[in-house]
Amino acid sequence: MTFLSIKGLFSRYASSQGPVYAVDDVDFDLDFGESIGIAGESACGKSTLGLSLIRMLSGGSSFGEIMFDDASILDLSESDFDSNFRWKKISMIFQGAMNSLDPVFTIEQQFVEILKQHGFDGNSDELILDSITSVNLDTNVLKKYPHELSGGMKQRVIIAMALILKPKFVIADEPTTALDVLIQAQIINLLKKLKKDGMSFMLITHDLAVLSEIADKIGIMYGGQMVEFGSSQEIYKNPKHPYTQGLLESIPTLKGNIPKYIPGTPPSLLDAPSECRFIDRCPLAIEKCKQLPPKFKTDTGYVRCWLYDDEK
């Protein structure tokens, strides 16, 4: 049963040079218990997509359809969304979040402030303890200040803060960035445990190897568009879009294959899409790529590439 459905989602920022087309015509569905991975280069729209879902797009606007738990999120008033959805049903682990802890308050004080902000009036002590232990932290962490914690501990505190009101869906934006490999593994194992317990995630990352551990479905973002969407198995075993193929070929493997890089630079998001976003970097570009490609259906999703026009 579908619990998150996105149709024709657009998100734009205003700038002195005109609108920034950060998210352009994105579609995907998730069923209960499923998690999605969003991958792509920096500034491709990944974080904006996550912020659009939780309606925290500072300086920007979104339009289209986001159906979550049978409610049209974008049609709700800010007060309704804040009272009934934000942090209660959908929450977010922000990019670089472990640096956002307030240095002058203890961890416990910061948990209490979150609960106050979201109008919680139950047993806060019990809820905070439950949240801390769910991410494998000792309760003595609550009396400490952020500077007394390691990077991995701070990241787990941030995850616990996102989970404190037991949301159904958590958006995790680069949760392993700036952590060493050992701590990255601990965070990934924690997310896998939470997923096994029934929580759904949107994991935003530039690292496709990380997504292979958690994601049931994967969306590949490029130039503000989701150029390919499908099951994790299909994306890894039979990637369709040349950009997806390039990303996978850039991953080092134990087989000794030499990683390849994708030449060129991403397009400016100040330009409204009028042709394939990947045309200037694509080794397989054809004349038809000068037109904006539609979404061609695949076995488990879709691909935005004219090479599959004959297969629709």
Positions of the model-derived regions?
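Short catalytic/signature loops enriched in Gly
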Residues: 142, 229-312
